[in-house]
A protein has these predicted regions:
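Bacterial Sec-dependent N-terminal signal peptides
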Residues: 1-22
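Beta-propeller blade termini and top-face loops
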Residues: 19-220
Length: 220
């Protein structure tokens, strides 16, 4: 009887503490819409906020994008602190993702010819404090506004490569869900600036892409 009771208790415990499934992209999107509406209806929406700087910790830097023609200008992405821009070699920084629906950054790439910014959301460092993202964000006005270009269920985007000869051709590496299986992971490619994506590499629903690079003499 004791053995039977112990077995039943172990089974109940296993069920109670089993891994929770990943949050569906549709649920995340609904939450973002609700957040946007709350911000619009907030009684303090017109009050200015002033940055007091890093108080407890400054956050994890996950990526840089440096202007090859002007190396004192660059963007810095933080795991859960958005994207920041400097044009004076870091003497001062300006936040450029305050108007985006998320601050969780995995990687950043910039087309320095026209100023278009691509941000892969979702921190790529795998830990219990890593926040998932909402896909791939794109800004064509240097961060004033952002568009979601898809891959919303990838959760963590690790790499973005822009074809220097054709900025509409972009390759993206996606980690996928950290602690559960999903199919939106691997390598994706667009030839129309992110309107549509084609999966070019998929191993299985448990394997993601941490980093990708391209031959500088042959992007494809």
């Amino acid at each position: 009887m004791n053995k039977l009771f112990l077995s039943a208790l172990c089974l109940a415990t296993a069920v109670s503490f089993s891994q929770q499934p990943a949050t569906p992209a549709t649920v995340v999107a609904n939450g973002i819409n609700a957040k946007t509406q709350l911000a619009q209806d907030s009684p303090v929406k017109n009050l200015p906020f002033i940055s007091i700087g890093p108080t407890i910790m400054s956050g994890r830097v996950v990526d840089f994008a440096v202007n090859p023609n002007n190396p004192i200008e660059f963007y810095v992405g933080y795991a859960s602190g958005g994207l920041w821009h400097t044009n004076n070699n870091g003497t001062s920084f300006t936040p450029v993702m305050d108007n985006s629906p998320t601050q969780n950054v995995g990687c950043v790439a910039v087309d320095w010819q026209n100023g278009t910014i691509w941000v892969g959301t979702g921190e790529v460092n795998a830990s219990r404090s890593s926040y998932a993202g909402i896909g791939l964000l794109k800004s064509e006005d240097k961060g004033k506004t952002w568009q979601n270009m898809g891959l919303t269920d990838s959760h963590h985007i690790s790499s973005i490569l822009i074809n220097p000869s054709n900025p509409d051709e972009v390759i993206v590496g996606a980690v996928g869900h950290l602690y559960s299986t999903n199919d939106e992971r691997g390598v994706f490619k667009t030839t129309d600036g992110g309107k549509t994506w084609r999966k070019t590499l998929f191993i299985n629903n448990e394997t993601g892409i941490i980093e990708i690079s391209a031959n500088p003499k042959n992007f494809n």
